[in-house]
A protein has these predicted regions:
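Unchanged
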Residues: 51-76, 84-138, 164
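Hydrophobic "anchor" residues
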Residues: 32-33
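A short gly/proline-enriched turn/hairpin at secondary-structure junctions
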Residues: 45-49
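Acidic, metal-coordinating catalytic segment for phosphate/diphosphate chemistry
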Residues: 1-23
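Short loop/turn segments immediately following the C-termini of beta-strands
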Residues: 38
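Charged phosphate-binding loop/patch that engages nucleotide di/tri-phosphates or the phosphate backbone
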Residues: 144-165
Length: 165
């Protein structure tokens, strides 16, 4: 079957759907994690969002674009820390890519400008306080990414925020 085959569109439409999301894990010099507070759901999040794959965007590009949109910083994502297969109720699964955003300087932190249409506030949170702010699987993803940074290990594969054995 080729892309010019009349049945190709039907074939593609029948394939399983998967969404993609991408975020950056930013820290300060003390190792605290930068979180943002969305106005459209409970809990806190990392700067990031949906990858605009239909527009040809890849996960790394999506993480950079979302960081610029949400906190006003144009920072190239560093290495890939975690990939998480996130099952959902009432939506297709999401493949969530989490990149190292690096350590922000005091000047970069002072330059943060929130996307007011989506975000209420931001704050820096210690690793121990992450479970208080992050709901469910995101907390596991962030902890796993911090472990990768601490150990120097390679990218961690997760399912629903838990390492795959």
């Amino acid at each position: 079957m080729t892309t010019t085959d009349p049945h190709y569109a039907t074939y593609i439409a029948g394939l399983p759907k998967v969404l993609a999301g991408a975020a950056c894990l930013f820290r300060d010099a003390e190792g605290r994690v930068l979180l943002v507070e969305p106005n459209y759901r409970e809990g806190w999040a990392l700067p990031g969002g949906t990858v605009e794959s239909e527009a040809g965007e890849g996960p790394r590009q999506g993480a950079r674009r979302e960081t610029l949109e949400e906190i006003g910083l144009d920072i190239a994502p560093g290495r890939l820390l975690a990939v998480d297969w996130v099952r959902g109720a009432g939506r297709p699964p999401i493949v969530a890519y989490l990149y190292d955003g690096g350590v922000l300087t005091p000047e970069q932190l002072a330059a943060i400008r929130l996307q007011e249409e989506e975000l209420l506030s931001w704050k820096l949170v210690t690793r121990d306080d992450l479970p208080v702010h992050l709901l469910g699987r995101l907390a596991g993803r962030v902890r796993a990414a911090l472990d990768v940074l601490e150990s120097g290990a390679g990218t961690v594969e997760l399912e629903d925020g838990k390492p795959v054995a």
